[in-house]
Amino acid sequence: MKPKFIVIEGLEGAGKSTAIALCQSFLNSKKIDFINVREPGGTPLAESLRTLVKAQHDEEIAFETELLIMYAARSQLMHNVINPALEQGQWVLADRHDLSSQAYQGGGRGISANTLASLSSMVLKGLKPDLTIYLDIDPVIGLERAKGRGELDRIEQEAIEFFQRTRMRYLELANDDNSIKTVDANQSIEHVHRDITNVLRTFFAEQK
């Protein structure tokens, strides 16, 4: 079986960390050799960019600046970690990927699809996740969960309307792409785990 690229996506408080732990357990049960990455981040430079883009600053950060920082971090991760791992036969399990930029910067910030497509093409060079599990949650519920974890970062402090637009774009993109599987994260954790496991089982059954 060729190495696969699996991504977990969702708004703040959707339960991505728990979902990733479940995926790790599933992959281990299948004796799959895989690595974990997160976006933005995953390399020393990309982690510095993560800190930079999430922090509060004394000046306003332009939407385009935020977008370019995200893609700069993604470029480092692709070049230094993801592409080499896949080439060496390892699977990749990612906490966020390009879909986050399409949803947050495209839907939330209103940056044009053409701009996003241009950056995506330059950085990804055609590489696309084999499976994306999108954890769909009501932004109000998700942000309440996120607040329970501690202080919110710069992006997490955006108005609820920002997250509503982001969610709408996530749902639109998931509806148009068969490789994106939507899981209702408003359910109990037991039901969410069941649905994620079913997605993974179906995905594996379809592989050769």
Curated annotation (Swiss-Prot):
Alphabetical list of Pfam families matching this protein: Thymidylate_kin
Superkingdom of this protein's organism: Bacteria
E.C. numbers: 2.7.4.9
Keyword Chaperone: no
Top-tier EC class: transferase
Catalytic activity: dTMP + ATP = dTDP + ADP
Family: Belongs to the thymidylate kinase family.
Purpose: Phosphorylation of dTMP to form dTDP in both de novo and salvage pathways of dTTP synthesis.
Protein name in UniProt: Thymidylate kinase
Organism: Pseudoalteromonas translucida (strain TAC 125)
